[in-house]
A protein has these predicted regions:
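TOPRIM metal-binding catalytic domain and adjacent DNA-binding surface shared by DnaG-type primases
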Residues: 1-62, 67-68, 104-105, 205-209
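Phosphate-handling DNA/RNA-contact segment within nucleic-acid enzymes
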Residues: 7, 48-152, 166-167
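A residue-level signal for conserved active-site and pocket-lining positions in enzyme catalytic cores
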Residues: 29, 69, 155, 188
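Acidic beta-strand-to-loop metal/phosphate-binding motif
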Residues: 112, 150-162, 181
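Short, acidic/turn-prone active-site loops that include or flank metal/cofactor-
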Residues: 133-139, 158-161, 182-185
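RNase H-like two-metal-ion nuclease catalytic core shared by retroviral integrases
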Residues: 165, 185-194
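Short, aromatic/basic amphipathic alpha-helical patches
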Residues: 165-174
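Metal-dependent DNA phosphodiester-chemistry modules and their immediately adjacent helices/loops
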Residues: 182, 192-209
Length: 209
């Protein structure tokens, strides 16, 4: 009798499937400063041939959440303005912290930002260890415990009231936060595209670290 695949195995299978179609997203990704090499390293993909139950995600960017044990979740982002909603998650799956492997790589400090693309930008394109949350209101108490040991936590906040509120919420959590808010209407990725990696390092005073 054939044994059914575990949830972990199903996620790994889906990730590998979608990663094989990542080239379909390269026009979008390169427009946001994400190279093919970075996309491959983060195991980004496109839902071209959906796994069973993933039919609603066809044509979307697949963003895997990867831990030491492997793929633990996949979120799906619209690649065109007509795709609504912009982000979709799998039913019944609670949001998680993105790019948690950077927690072990980081030393005295780490960055936090909203969104997977922003976190990927800081981590892989700028060289700043970073974790990302699924949205400005998605912070959870156990995330705080994961970051408790850092001397500095740089919050790269979106350039809007929600972004500032998100950063202030992390201060209330007791983390040693330095707020780095982007200009109005901008986010971390858009400022990377416009001004490059050095701008984002300088904003945090990390240009010499």
């Amino acid at each position: 009798m054939k044994q059914s695949l575990s949830q972990k195995e199903l996620l790994e299978k889906a990730c590998a499937n979608y990663q094989a179609s990542v080239n379909l997203a390269l026009p979008y990704l390169t427009g946001r400063g994400i190279t093919a090499q970075v996309a491959q390293s983060a195991r980004l993909g496109v839902v071209e041939h959906p796994e069973i139950g993933h039919e609603a995600y066809v044509g979307r960017l697949a963003i895997p959440y990867i831990t030491k044990t492997g793929v633990v979740d996949i979120r799906f982002r619209a690649l065109t303005p007509d795709q609504e909603p912009k982000y979709m998650g799998m039913p019944g799956v609670k949001t998680k912290l993105y790019n948690v492997l950077d927690i072990e790589k980081a030393k005295d400090w780490i960055a936090v930002c909203e969104g997977e693309i922003d976190a990927l930008t800081l981590s892989r394109c700028v060289g700043i260890p970073c974790v990302g949350v699924a949205g400005a209101t998605s912070w959870k108490p156990h995330y705080t415990r994961l970051l408790d040991d850092f001397e500095r936590v740089y919050v790269y906040a979106d350039g809007d009231s929600a972004g500032l509120s998100f950063a202030k919420d992390l201060i209330k959590e007791g983390l040693p936060v330095t707020i780095i808010q982007m200009p109005e209407g901008e986010d971390t990725n858009s400022m990377f595209v416009k001004n490059g990696a050095e701008y984002l390092r300088e904003r945090a005073g990390l240009d010499n670290e």
